[in-house]
């Protein structure tokens, strides 16, 4: 997929995404505490942690669905503090949510086309639809089928394809392998790696830590809403704490 061209690229060596000391609440309940990390252009970065650690909330904060109460999120050096979620998509940030959140009564093609709702994405919708269907041949076979009748793996493909219709620079995936058979998980991770090779920067939340660390450049471990560890994937895979707590070794 082509990357958005509406904003200047970050300077060489500069982060594409900066999450800077964000505090996020649900009502009076604080979920993230001064959380900070960055993603550089061209990377796959994975967020690791147990259920309830704050990984999904982090993605929602970046996408604008759960704005931080304090701290800041910057994309290409620009603060997103006053940028609504819809505008963030146009800037190049796309989220594939946990649970896929498709429109089950609409066809596969209609679900995909709904991902191209921004002005720039609408202009390239036909071209991007062809690319998505080439990336996911199963969707091409089922383009007229209702999304609600798809298998779990096919629904994940459809949700990912819908996000790609917006031509994201940063693609965020929340638990893409959740509930899928191992062979389908391998297919999903293969597609993520292929997107990365095509130039898409990826921020991945994934329950299958072995698979995530195998394709990611770096990882950030979140515990109770705070960054616990971060570093290259190889170093995290070899870390005794990570191996014991998350890999069962």
Feature map (PLM): residue ranges:
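The feature captures the beta-strand-to-loop junction immediately N-terminal to the Walker
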Residues: 48-50
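ABC ATPase C-loop
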Residues: 163-164
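Conserved catalytic motifs of ABC-family nucleotide-binding domains
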Residues: 167
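Helix-to-loop junction immediately C-terminal to a conserved catalytic motif
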Residues: 63
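Conserved ABC transporter NBD signature motif
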Residues: 71-79, 91, 124-129, 231
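Conserved ABC ATPase signature
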Residues: 146-150, 154
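ABC-type ATPase nucleotide-binding domains, specifically the catalytic core motifs of the NBD
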Residues: 27, 83, 108-127, 135-140, ...
């Amino acid at each position: 997929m082509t990357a958005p061209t509406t904003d200047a690229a970050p300077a060489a060596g500069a982060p594409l995404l900066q999450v800077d000391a964000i505090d996020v609440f649900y009502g009076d309940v604080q979920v993230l505490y001064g959380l900070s990390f960055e993603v550089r252009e061209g990377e796959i970065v994975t967020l690791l942690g147990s259920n309830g650690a704050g990984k999904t909330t982090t993605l929602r904060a970046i996408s604008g669905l759960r704005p931080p109460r304090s701290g800041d999120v910057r994309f290409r050096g620009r603060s997103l503090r006053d940028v609504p979620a819809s505008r963030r998509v146009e800037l190049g940030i796309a989220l594939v949510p946990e649970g896929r959140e498709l429109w089950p009564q609409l066809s596969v093609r209609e679900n995909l086309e709904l991902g191209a709702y921004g002005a720039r994405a609408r202009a390239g919708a036909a071209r991007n639809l062809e690319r998505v269907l080439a990336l996911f041949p199963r969707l091409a076979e089922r383009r007229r089928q209702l999304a609600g009748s798809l298998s779990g793996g096919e629904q994940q493909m459809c949700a990912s394809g819908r996000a790609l219709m917006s031509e994201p620079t940063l693609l965020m995936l929340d638990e893409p392998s959740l509930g899928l058979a191992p062979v389908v998980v391998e297919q999903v991770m293969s597609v993520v790696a292929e997107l990365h090779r095509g130039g898409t920067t990826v921020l991945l939340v994934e329950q299958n830590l072995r698979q995530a660390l195998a394709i990611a450049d770096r990882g950030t471990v979140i515990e109770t809403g705070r960054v616990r560890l971060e570093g290259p994937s190889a170093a995290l895979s070899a870390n005794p704490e990570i191996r014991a707590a998350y890999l069962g070794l």
